[in-house]
Amino acid sequence: NILKKRSDLNAIGFLSESGYEENITWNDLYKKVCKLSAYFKTLSLKKGDRVAAYVPNKIESIVSFLACAKNGIIWSSCSPDFGVQGVVDRFKQIKPKILITSDHYFYNGKKINILEKINKVLEEIPSINEVLVFSYNKKEKLNLDNFKDFDEVLNQSELDETFERFEFNHPIYILYSSGTTGKPKCITHGAGNVLIEHNKEFMLHCDIRDGEKLFYYTTTGWMMWNWLVGGLATGSSIFLFDGAPVYPKIDVLLEYCQNKKINLFGVSAKYIDHLKNEKYNSKNLDLSSIKIITSTGSPL
């Protein structure tokens, strides 16, 4: 359902707070998902197995999630700002066979290493037997010893265009409760339910149509990331931002909306409150493309 569209137009756009940008077309997204799903099969990953992802909000994260969904593998992700214990508390419960991660990410002007945490995670989760790593910046070559290079795996894999049908309620991903009352609790979502609910919310509630542009500021550890990915099923393009929402300047997200002519813009209530408290005025930006702003996470 998400990969049904074929086009040389962009399906996903990505911007880092560092200024680094990437895009992927619908056609290339389809090919990468099919190649990664083929690789998963070589590892004997099967329907119902779990893949854990400790990843920034990048295109590779979505490719990985969709490859899992294609094979009936259950996805679960944490954002890299989670500490080792936070990751272990979540992933240890689901006994993943593979961990997907990146070499680093950026936040508030700092380049933060992710790989230095991975060995500690592996010590606590013995079910993980392979780690797949993608480079945050394609201009920077990975230097890996015991882990697999994401791009090399894709380049060497066959194009598997077989799509197996699964039960309507077959699990597509595992999310988690906040962990404020004990350890985070697993919340499993069924694929059919998610697809129908997200299509309803995008197309009926938000009036989103094929070819429009969706941007929600989120991390891979928040349910709004999963929601945003669901927007691809409408034929809309989605846009990702990785980093602090007000770095390198207070209106970096709004400027992104202007430059990409975003139609749906989603943020947390805290972000809107921050703009209000700073008395920010967007009069120097052209935000006329935005037809709906959504907010969640706390009362506005």
Functional labels for PLM-detected ranges:
Residues 50, 56-84, 94-99, 212-213, ...:
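A short helix-loop-beta submotif of the ANL/AMP-binding
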Residues 195-213, 221-263, 278-280:
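Conserved AMP-binding/adenylation subdomain of ANL enzymes
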Residues 56-58, 218-222:
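AMP-binding (ANL) adenylation modules
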Residues 8-10, 132-133, 145-176, 183, ...:
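Conserved pre-ATP/AMP-binding loop-to-beta segment of ANL
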Residues 2-25, 135-142:
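AMP-dependent adenylate-forming
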Residues 12-66, 83-88, 146-152, 189-192:
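Conserved AMP-binding/adenylate-forming core of the ANL superfamily
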Residues 84, 91-101, 105-144, 234, ...:
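Conserved adenylate-forming
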Residues 51, 68, 171, 177-180, ...:
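Conserved S/T- and glycine-rich ATP-binding loop of Class I adenylate-forming
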